[in-house]
């Protein structure tokens, strides 16, 4: 059960079979590691530990359950997936659905040539007491000693930040959070979070500013299903797409209360939200007057009090068909959120920026979609910097579509730009405002028979036929053009 290798463009066997390891612990590993340690201490050999949740183990072929076993799913064999990419796509649907089950799902089995691999179910999301116990351990909050005296840019970015929850129910097709943490939120208690904030405030070099109070998504703290019996039956990969689940308690009130408690601590001048905000969550009407009022208040307080000059959000694309595959909201919702952002800034006398992230060459995206993206973002006065070309990453729906050519939930074919030329043709539309790109883009729009878009992008007109002399083939994006995913 391993995704394709991007560099080789091959479907590899399970990483367990490619390594000398006896067992793999996957996901957030506190619970399985503790269980393994206790069983080892009791004298149990590793070879006998075949039932530990969140582990992957080798099994004999004669141990593979029957296809109709109630407590297991037998996936298409690795050999069959090598022959039939549609079989691999079908496998992924089971993998994603089970990783998002409230109870952790069932075991997944896959046969190889002379043995089988069993992926034991995930643990259910941690309780508040369990996640507090993990976060309250006496961490040093310092890099490893081998880096003493060296600057680590990633550490500098997060050293004064606090993680307040795990899990994400956004279900973005290109994200691996569900594979690591699941979609159900495990929230720390306010007391645990405040203890850590006090520790951060006492760190050398702290000047009163928390860089982030966040998580995989910034604004899912304390959220869960209203009726957990409904959640227990649910296998939706996203609680927000195609529209927010009516069973979701999306009240941002507890999160606002947490922000207020943190900001009231001695030594805290301001707490910023550096994690990505799901504006489709805070803007979705719920029908509950109190929740809707809290969510409107969240948007205002977030923009007015918790932005360090730039607010990061991720519309990712403007095309309805592309964002549907991505499991992201329609671009129109970003327009509405930007209007709120601009209004709050004007009323508060602030000069903050909203920084949208976009992806080119995502499965389902055609060059014409990127041309329309360029026009739509130009019309909004945006010159994009935080962008990336889609790169396959393990355990994501998008990567399965990229490799197999099929959508795992429909098994219908999906176009994906795969060659360097196809990907470069899409990516260049991000930089329509760069004079070095204009002639090449004008030629491309002529090839696409879209003079309407050419006139909108370049109302003054751009002569065609000079692309080769105006833009090197290996042109790089502007510096700091996209954060890592």
Provide a role label for each language-model segment:
Residues 1-112, 119-120, 124:
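Glycine-rich beta-alpha loop elements in corrinoid/cobalamin-binding modules
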Residues 90-161:
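N-terminal [4Fe-4S]-dependent radical SAM core
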Residues 175-192:
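Iron-sulfur (Fe-S) cluster-binding segments and ferredoxin-like electron-carrier domains
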Residues 22, 134, 168, 172, ...:
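Conserved, mostly hydrophobic/aromatic
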Residues 362-378:
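Catalytic cores of alpha/beta
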Residues 150-176, 209:
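N-terminal pre-triad scaffold of radical SAM enzymes
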Residues 199-355, 359-363:
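Conserved SAM/AdoMet-binding glycine-rich loop
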Residues 231, 237, 460-485:
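Acidic, low-complexity intrinsically disordered tails
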């Amino acid at each position: 059960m391993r995704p394709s290798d991007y560099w080789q463009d091959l479907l590899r066997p399970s990483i367990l079979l490619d390594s000398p390891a006896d067992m793999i612990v996957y996901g957030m590993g506190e619970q399985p590691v503790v269980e393994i340690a206790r069983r080892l201490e009791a004298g149990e050999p590793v070879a006998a530990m075949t039932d530990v949740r969140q582990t992957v183990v080798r099994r004999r072929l004669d141990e593979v359950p029957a296809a109709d076993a109630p407590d297991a799913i037998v996936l298409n064999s690795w050999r069959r997936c090598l022959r039939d990419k549609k079989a691999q796509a079908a496998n992924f649907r089971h993998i994603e659905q089970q990783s998002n089950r409230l109870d952790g799902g069932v075991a997944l089995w896959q046969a190889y040539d002379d043995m089988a691999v069993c992926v034991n179910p995930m643990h259910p999301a941690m309780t508040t007491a369990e996640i507090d116990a993990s976060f309250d351990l006496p961490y040093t909050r310092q890099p490893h000693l081998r880096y003493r005296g060296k600057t680590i840019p990633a550490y500098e970015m997060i050293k004064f930040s606090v993680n307040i929850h795990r899990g994400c129910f956004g279900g973005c097709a290109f994200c691996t959070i569900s594979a690591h943490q699941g979609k159900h939120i495990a929230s720390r208690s306010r007391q645990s979070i405040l203890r850590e904030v006090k520790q951060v405030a006492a760190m050398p070099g702290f000047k009163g500013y928390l860089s982030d109070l966040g998580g995989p998504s910034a604004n899912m703290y304390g959220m869960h299903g209203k009726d957990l019996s409904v959640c227990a039956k649910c296998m939706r990969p996203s609680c927000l797409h195609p529209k927010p689940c009516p069973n979701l308690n999306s009240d941002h009130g507890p999160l606002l209360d947490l922000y207020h408690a943190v900001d009231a601590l001695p030594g805290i001048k301001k707490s910023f939200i550096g994690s990505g905000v799901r504006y489709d969550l805070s803007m979705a009407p719920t029908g509950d007057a109190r929740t809707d009022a809290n969510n409107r208040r969240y948007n205002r307080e977030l923009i007015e009090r918790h932005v360090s000059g730039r607010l990061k959000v991720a519309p990712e694309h403007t095309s309805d068909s592309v964002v549907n595959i991505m499991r992201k909201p329609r671009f129109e919702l970003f327009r509405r959120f930007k209007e709120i952002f601009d209004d709050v800034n004007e009323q508060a006398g602030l000069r903050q920026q909203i920084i949208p992230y976009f992806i080119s060459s995502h499965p389902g995206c055609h060059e014409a979609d990127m041309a329309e993206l360029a026009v739509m973002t130009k019309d909004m006065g945006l010159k994009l910097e935080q962008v990336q070309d889609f790169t396959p990453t393990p355990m994501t729906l998008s990567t399965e579509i990229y490799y197999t050519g099929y959508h795992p939930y429909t098994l219908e074919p999906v176009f994906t730009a795969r060659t360097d030329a196809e990907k470069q043709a899409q990516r260049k539309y991000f930089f329509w405002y760069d004079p070095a790109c204009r002639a090449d883009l004008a030629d491309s729009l002529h090839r696409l028979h879209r003079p309407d878009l050419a006139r909108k992008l370049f109302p003054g007109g751009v002569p065609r036929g000079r692309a080769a002399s105006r833009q090197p083939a290996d042109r790089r994006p502007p510096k700091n053009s996209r954060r890592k995913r």
